[in-house]
Amino acid sequence: VGQEFYGEYLAKTDPLGADVPNPVSHVAYGYATQMCVLDKKTGRIKKLVAAHDVGKAVNPLSCEGQIEGGVVMSMGYALTEQYPIDDTCKPTAKYGTLGLFRANQIPPEIQAIVVEKPGLNVAGGAIGIGEITSIPTAPAIADAYYRLDGQRRLTLPLENTPYAKKK
């Protein structure tokens, strides 16, 4: 809290419609950070803040929706989803038993912060807001639980949380 960090990475892309062999039309990088706030009494997530660098937000509302959707999807990965496989990597569970995150488990607040850096010399100034939305969630949640109870959780789904499947 109260700290600020700055980083920058610029990649060269060819202009849209450029007549060059093997044009570079887009870049695949991004910067994202997330913070999880737990209810100290229940251990459930009260709020998750997600800030994502998108370059130019061509459609800001859609960017926010992409962030929120990625956060919810990866909350399931972090907290409830089990995907058991056998030695041949064949799934051994039925879809309904995988522990997908449910609508009633979504925290009261997901704050999506779209960070723009206009003027980038890339395709339309946008650098993308896809898979990156789901990457920082599990570490943010694991760190919140560590700060709550001092216990490091190093496997997913995280154990000893109110969301964990009872054994």
Whereabouts are the PLM-identified features?
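C-terminal catalytic domains of large/alpha subunits in multi-subunit enzymes
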Residues: 1-167
